[in-house]
Amino acid sequence: ANVSFSLSGADSKSYSKFITALRKALPSKEKVSNIPLLLPSASGASRYILMQLSNYDAKAITMAIDVTNVYIMGYLVNSTSYFANESDAKLASQYVFKGSTLVTIPYSGNYERLQNAAGKIREKIPLGFRALDSALTSIFHYDSTAAAAAFLVILQTTAEASRFKYIEGQIIERIPKNEVPSPAALSLENEAWSLLSKQIQLAQTNNGAFRTPVVIIDNKGQRVEITNLASKVQIKDVNSKLLLNKQNIA
């Protein structure tokens, strides 16, 4: 695997080290406003990196991540691989986990479909190290409904934390006790990454101003407009994005 994280003996330092390693494992050729810009495209096996996660019992799961958008395409448990029911994941299955027995999960990996499959919304699903342990255990012993809820925990603890320093901090706060995500974290996960990525890139040729303001929710549940690169968002650190998605420039 390119990056790995084990819950056994983990603390805030080892988790932060893992998230930093995950960011570094995602290739970037340029920066915009000092934020790494992910590749617009990649082909073949070079489009994916592998991330290994282990629960407290040292049961390991390996996940394949698309380097252009930090989406999890599928995962490997022992000799069985599981891929989301979508075209990008089918493509990934041609390049990663070769020789494994392939199972198609009956839903795609976006939040709405995962929430439908899980029968739960993210607002009600706690995050934290114990939540991550339960999620990894659920995925290890595959059950499609439990796996959907587990995926929601894993996505936020890994991919979203790598995109936003703020979300990484939110997970660290939840290490000692499970707690549902903050309104600000959920707001950032809901399209804000794509919208902010696009506007930050467009602002380069617009004197630092966004062409379209991006509205996010702060920790108190209030709407906040980000209008330019210098916007000091009321939520501490919420706009310290650490990765940008190149695909969203139009």
From Swiss-Prot:
Domain of life: Eukaryota
Catalytic activity, as annotated: Endohydrolysis of the N-glycosidic bond at one specific adenosine on the 28S rRNA
Enzyme class (EC, first level): hydrolase
Coiled coil found in the keyword field: no
GO biological process: defense response to virus; negative regulation of translation
Statement: the UniProt record of this protein carries the keyword Hydrolase: yes
The EC number(s) this enzyme carries: 3.2.2.22
GO function terms (MF aspect): rRNA N-glycosylase activity; toxin activity
Swiss-Prot/TrEMBL keywords: Antiviral defense, Hydrolase, Plant defense, Protein synthesis inhibitor, Toxin
Active-site residues, record numbering mapped to chain: 160
Family the UniProt entry places it in: Belongs to the ribosome-inactivating protein family. Type 1 RIP subfamily.
Entry protein name: Ribosome-inactivating protein luffin-B
Organism: Luffa aegyptiaca (Sponge gourd)
